[in-house]
């Protein structure tokens, strides 16, 4: 696999290899959403390749940056609606809800963090909840 390749870079490398690339490891989180619009996830979905998602929690920005307080508030509301154990679980559920079916990379060896990510698989996030989180992270309505 590769890491942080644009669709053009991925296609170029793939065209020169005698084997199929396994994945593209990319940053995906509510606080980092460009890949939802730049074709990266679309390309991987078209090729039936599951991306690996790094920094799902935004490298701590989600919890430490005042700019993301509205996002934290919305994540807390959705956590209550889903009966989730934490907003962290809701973030992982948000990533898992993407049609490209990303595989989150858990950047921690702490068992409680790994458990939160695994338990996110059981959350049944609605499309409306997903878009509310997207809107709260962006700070404006999603067209």
Region annotations inferred by a language model:
Residues 1-143:
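Beta/alpha (TIM)-barrel catalytic core signal, keyed to glycine-rich beta->alpha loops juxtaposed to Asp/Glu
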């Amino acid at each position: 696999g590769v890491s942080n390749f644009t669709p053009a870079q991925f296609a170029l490398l793939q065209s020169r290899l005698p084997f199929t690339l396994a994945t593209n490891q990319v940053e995906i989180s509510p606080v980092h959403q460009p890949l939802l619009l730049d074709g990266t996830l679309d390309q991987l979905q078209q090729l039936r390749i599951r991306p690996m998602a790094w920094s799902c929690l935004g490298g701590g920005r989600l919890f430490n940056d005042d700019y993301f307080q509205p996002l934290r508030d919305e994540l807390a509301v959705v956590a209550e609606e889903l009966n989730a154990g934490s907003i962290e679980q809701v973030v992982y559920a948000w990533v898992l809800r993407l049609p490209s079916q990303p595989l989150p990379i858990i950047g921690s060896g702490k068992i409680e963090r790994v458990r939160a990510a695994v338990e996110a698989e059981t959350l049944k996030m609605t499309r409306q909840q997903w878009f509310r989180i997207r809107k709260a992270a962006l700070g404006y309505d999603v067209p």
